[in-house]
């Protein structure tokens, strides 16, 4: 039995995690893959959100248009960007996009968010975006405050250092109540990402090297959350073929196969898809 199947029997959910580059830089292709994944028993389909990537990647698809296509091609799987760098987005636009996509999908959206990085092709510096990590962290937190308020359906009055929303009501609301689940990405051993993660519905640790690292982060987040705590998700990205069972035992609730963006191909993704989670 594969490690993937063992983990699924332990209760770990599995989602395709598609870098929308080159072979996958086509919303029709991504939507077909999502439909195949749903038919094969996968629990989610998430996509990378970038405007460019370093060589040899040449083609990049828009994450949000692709997610709309995925929503139309599926009925059951969770879907969303994993992750979208909120600091390079306008929060009021994201408020409209998330509510619309959640309604389009019948309440299946999960919003993955993070700081973003300039290391993978200069997509921040080459487009005039903020490159200071500290400032992007502030913009991320402020954007999340605006989104949470917008999803409530009440008028939003926000006057912050980076954004202003002066008495706007964002209707219709998302299908999910009280709003779209948010998973925040960050380094597992850093204090600020863990505190941010504890305020929302899930954590997506990056650059994990072993399961013990994850266990420490899970314990830290648990200590920061209110009690009794509502359900919480921990998602891990691991290379295809890696046994995710130790990570499930450390607290992971979702496993995402992490494809190499420089070499990912449609055939490789379909191969992983066909090896999908075992039936419980």
Labelled PLM ranges:
Residues 1-280:
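Active-site-adjacent structural elements that line small-molecule/cofactor binding pockets in enzymes
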